[in-house]
Curated annotation (Swiss-Prot):
The keyword Nucleotide-binding appears for this protein: yes
Region (Domain IV, binds dsDNA): 358-484
GO biological process, one term: DNA replication initiation
Region described as Domain I, interacts with DnaA modulators: 1-73
Comment block on domains: Domain I is involved in oligomerization and binding regulators, domain II is flexibile and of varying length in different bacteria, domain III forms the AAA+ region, while domain IV binds dsDNA.
Binding residue positions for ATP: 185, 187-189
Designated name of the protein: Chromosomal replication initiator protein DnaA
Matching SUPFAM superfamilies: P-loop containing nucleoside triphosphate hydrolases, TrpR-like
Any one GO MF annotation of this record: lipid binding
Phylogenetic classification of the source organism: Bacteria, Pseudomonadati, Spirochaetota, Spirochaetia, Spirochaetales
């Protein structure tokens, strides 16, 4: 029994490293170990849909992990229905108690799990297919690091900040819906997440869900494939607050726009708060239904513009303080003067300064700053290209030529470190040079899953900030793609 638990813990630890926080929470946080008989490990799932999805998405990877860890003969079985539980000689009473214990463990780890879940289990004598554990929607997606307290206010974002704070204090009252629009890296997501976190603090009974437009789309498509559209509609139309990030990603996608239209109406009629973010005004959205655009303009539309010099200085100072580095005033002003794009680039500049200090053990001077600024400006210029300007085949040609690989390498399943690294880079470049979704990118790279592509993109993004060699390689590849 104990060995089985240990093996399951190894599997969870390995998968956690490969998935985003929200994906791991969605698929693995509410699974629990039941028993281990011989070489079979039994894992209980909260409902049949969850069981089917975990098997479909992760069975192959779990088997690979078992082989890697030296447990090739072990089999992991996911169970749900009462009949299955009885087949495994597990009394329904025991399962109910284990479910309660598991639920209490989850509540200890995460205070925001719906207390309703515990009531459901405590008030039932058996764990059956109809008695699902309902976990509060909001929690996996809200990141506690985003708060109103650490949002730096300036003339470019003060109105958006004040509106967001007002919404969190009085959701569904004044500004419903609210749409915050502006360029990349200006703080839209920070404000959106801050609304969720503050509302959660002030209105503990609220069902709050933050979701990106891409994940909203992916979940909708998946619900169609699995005939679970009713579950999807119920999830999104019974919220107290919907926070939908990057709605511009839904352009040219009529099906999901139709679903969002009906979700909007359902929430609006019930006076439930909705906040959206976009990289442009609703009127500028392309291939977006007029009736949906008109819904966005019913409430408050507020923009965030690029930070002015004073705000840029404040942002750099705060980031430097968080990273534990001292930036001389002349260097600080130089970065603020040269990097005028957005907050993300300002913070990236400080991160790169820290990398130079930590990895090369040198003092910051204007030469280093100039080099870093050139890298950031080159990266921004690279990302101004549209999918029409950058051909997907050009990206592939550069990757194959510069990294000395073949089509089979880049689209196959080789585990060789250099090939795996190349696939990560390929996914990252496709994401940055095109408007392809992670699902579409996965198809290009040999049928990889959404979670695999997301892992690749996030890995390269993190590596660029802490590994100068990787960062220089990416910049070099980007330059060659532009020239190709």
């Amino acid at each position: 029994m104990q060995e089985g638990k240990n093996i399951w813990s190894l599997i969870l630890a390995a998968i956690r490293k490969e998935l985003s926080e929200e994906e791991f929470y969605i698929w693995f946080e509410n699974l629990y170990f039941i028993d281990a008989i011989g070489e079979n490990i039994k894992i209980a799932t909260p409902n049949s849909f969850h069981k089917n999805q975990v098997e479909k998405r992760f069975s192959k990877r779990i088997k690979e992990i078992l082989i890697e860890k030296g447990h090739s003969t072990i089999n992991v079985e996911f169970i749900h229905s009462q009949n299955e539980l009885k087949d495994h000689n597990t009394e329904s009473k025991d399962i109910s108690l284990k479910a309660i214990t598991h639920q209490q463990d989850l509540q200890t780890k995460n205070k925001d799990i719906k207390t309703h879940a515990k009531n459901i289990i405590n008030n039932t004598k058996q764990y059956s297919i109809k008695e699902e554990i309902h976990i509060k929607y909001r929690n996996p997606f809200l990141k506690k690091k985003y708060t109103f307290e650490n949002f730096i206010i300036g003339t470019n974002n003060k109105l958006a900040y004040n509106a967001s704070l007002s919404i969190a204090k009085n959701p569904g009252k004044k500004y419903n819906p609210c749409l915050i629009y502006g360029g990349v890296g200006l703080g839209k997501t920070h404000l959106l997440q801050s609304i969720g976190n503050k509302t959660e603090e002030l209105h503990k009974e609220f069902k709050i869900l933050y979701v990106t437009a891409e994940n909203f789309l992916n979940e909708f498509v998946e619900s169609i494939k699995t005939n679970e559209t009713k579950r999807f509609k119920k999830k999104y139309r019974h919220l107290d607050m919907l926070l939908l990030d990057d709605i511009h990603d839904l352009q040219k996608k009529e099906g999901i726009q139709e679903e969002l239209f009906h979700t909007f109406n359902a929430l609006y009629e019930d006076n439930k708060q909705m906040v959206f973010t976009c990289d442009r005004q609703p009127s500028e959205l392309v291939n977006f239904t007029d009736r949906l655009k008109s819904r966005f303009t019913r409430g408050l539309n507020v923009d965030i513009s690029k930070p002015n010099f004073e705000l840029r200085v404040a942002i750099i100072e705060k980031k430097a303080e968080e990273d534990g580095i001292k930036v001389p005033k002349n260097i600080l002003n130089l970065v603020a003067k040269k990097v005028t794009t957005n907050i993300r680039d300002l913070e990236a500049a400080v991160t790169k300064l820290k990398a130079h200090i930590d990895l090369e053990d040198i003092e910051i001077d204007t030469n280093i700053v100039d080099k870093i600024i050139k890298e950031i400006i080159a990266y921004e210029n690279d990302n101004t290209n549209t999918p029409n300007k950058i051909n997907i085949e050009n990206i592939k040609k550069v990757i194959l030529r510069e990294l000395k690989l073949t089509n089979k390498d880049i689209e196959g399943n080789s585990k060789k470190p250099e090939i795996t690294k190349a696939r990560h880079i390929y996914a990252y470049l496709l994401r940055n040079f095109t408007e392809l979704s992670t699902i579409e990118i996965g198809k290009i790279i040999g049928g990889k899953t959404h979670s695999t592509v997301l892992y690749s993109i996030n890995k390269i993004d993190k590596d660029r900030n802490k590994n100068l060699e990787i960062n220089n390689l990416i910049i070099e590849l980007m330059n060659k793609i532009n020239k190709n």
